[in-house]
Amino acid sequence: IFSTEAGAETVASDIKAKGFASAVMEIDGSFTVFAGLGKEKAQTSALNEQYKQKDFADFWGGKQLSCSISTSSSAAQWASSIQELSSLSSLTANGNSVSDDEITKAESAIKEIKTSDETEKKLLEKLLLAADNVKNNQGWEAQQNLLDVMSGISSK
């Protein structure tokens, strides 16, 4: 957690330079660097091990943080899709396989989200891209797309 956005962005850039995912989000006036998403503690712990192998020791908080989202409609559908994809992408980033059925289910759920907001339409495209990343075993790319979506819909 950083008091300035510039400090947080510097850390996020360093993380991305090593091939990982990261995004900065303002929460309660401070800037937090998110470096991965997972549905369960075991998933984020496995992501943490990968960070440690790249000399990011002790930076991963491993905390479960909540983030409020603000969308024009269907907030519950957004949250459900992000949660499901965070699980699938963390599994893929950790070298585990994901079934085609799980990916198809996630894609179908995303396609059910309706919005007329242009920004949200672009974010829905990123969610579909994240599902495609998972399908192609590109877990960190999927994580980055999910973090970008979270940045776009988080309420400050």
Annotate each predicted stretch with a short phrase.
Residues 1, 15, 27, 69, ...:
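Weak global preference for isoleucine
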Residues 1-76:
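Solvent-exposed beta-strand motifs enriched in subsets of small alpha/beta binding domains
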Residues 1-2, 98-103, 138:
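Short charge-dense sequence patches
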Residues 7, 11, 47, 102, ...:
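Stable alpha-helical elements in mature extracytoplasmic
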Residues 11-14, 18, 50-54, 109, ...:
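Structured segments of extracytoplasmic/periplasmic soluble domains
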Residues 14-17, 99, 135:
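Short, solvent-exposed coil/turn linker segments
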Residues 60-110:
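Extended amphipathic alpha-helical interaction segments
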Residues 115-156:
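Extracytoplasmic/luminal low-complexity segments enriched in Pro/Gly and acidic/polar residues
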